[in-house]
Amino acid sequence: KLGKIRKIYVEYHQGWLSKLSEREGNAQAAWRTDPKRSGKSGCMGDIGTHAAHLAEYISGLKIKQMCASLNTVVEGRMLDDDGAILLRFEENATGVLTASQVAAGEENALKIRVYGENGGLEWAQQEPNTLTLRWSDKPAETLRAGSNYSDRESSYATSNCRTPGGHP
């Protein structure tokens, strides 16, 4: 119903590495920011990959090309803790992926917006029961997991939900 996919925005923001926590006794931060223990990538390897997989899964399109800007924001850190990637998908769709572990105040903010020629959708992990659909020719719709919708598309979404309303 969205039509041919044109644009995908996906983001995964956390704030738990806003400070140099790896040097303050945080064992989780210590191994995740040490390239000898966690590998060559920090933020993008840790959470950016989840955002990329979500974009491919939701859109049904595979990423074909990317151009990344990775940053180490917190002085003294050995790996990237923030970054942005321009994406090119199959069927000439484009996208932007941002991932950050220095977004102070954020817990686990994974969010996606997908736009096609007829409309778009938005979903956020912090509101997992809600899917917002926006159309070029009618008002936006908000679907909730476990609700009993009668139209074909909404009932398809509801029938594919494994949990009752109000459960993540």
Question: What kind of feature is each model-predicted range?
Answer:
Residues 10-16, 70-74, 91-93, 101-103, ...:
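Glycine-rich beta-alpha junction loops
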